[in-house]
């Protein structure tokens, strides 16, 4: 975000997402509270955000029709008017790109597992949150694990290889 501000971005769009994409992998699909509302934290703690218009609407990404309507209202009120048809097309393109990205992540996870098994390497799954890549709060655990000879993979890169576990507790987050 600081980089965007330094580059003179007029608008920064960082929505709040109470629910993450429903992957049907758990009892519910609540987003981690920190991830869901990280933009609220940034708004309250980054004075530099006053240099741009920081947009952080609450969005339901699991209903594209409602998402488009909500974005239309929000954009009309805060940025300018956009045709609903354009917003729907942008949402569809965004989800298509997300699917392509996730297919690449899964392929890389499979490639890493194959490499580790073929070369007798230990495998470490780093289960984290998106904000862990923030250099201001990252701890370098991935680099430490690699320096110790582990092949590291993210949970997103291999979760498709396992069946969901049904347990006797309510699994809130996926």
Report residues per predicted region.
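An N-terminal assembly and electron-transfer interface module characteristic of large anaerobic redox
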Residues: 1-174
């Amino acid at each position: 975000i600081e980089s965007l501000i330094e580059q003179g971005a007029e608008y920064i769009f960082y929505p709040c997402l109470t629910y993450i994409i429903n992957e049907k992998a758990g009892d519910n699909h609540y987003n981690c509270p920190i991830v869901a509302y990280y933009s609220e934290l940034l708004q309250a703690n980054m004075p530099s955000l006053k240099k741009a218009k920081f947009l952080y609407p609450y969005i339901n990404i699991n209903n594209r029709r409602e998402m488009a309507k909500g974005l239309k209202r929000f954009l009309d009120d805060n940025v300018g008017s956009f045709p609903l048809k354009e917003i729907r097309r942008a949402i569809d393109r965004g989800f298509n790109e997300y699917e392509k990205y996730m297919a690449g992540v899964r392929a890389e996870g499979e490639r890493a597992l194959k490499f580790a098994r073929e070369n007798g390497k230990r495998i470490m799954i780093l289960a984290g949150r998106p904000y862990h890549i923030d250099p201001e709060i990252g701890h370098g655990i991935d680099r430490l694990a690699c320096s110790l000879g582990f092949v590291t993979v993210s949970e997103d890169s291999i979760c498709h290889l396992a069946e969901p576990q049904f347990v006797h507790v309510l699994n809130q987050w996926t």
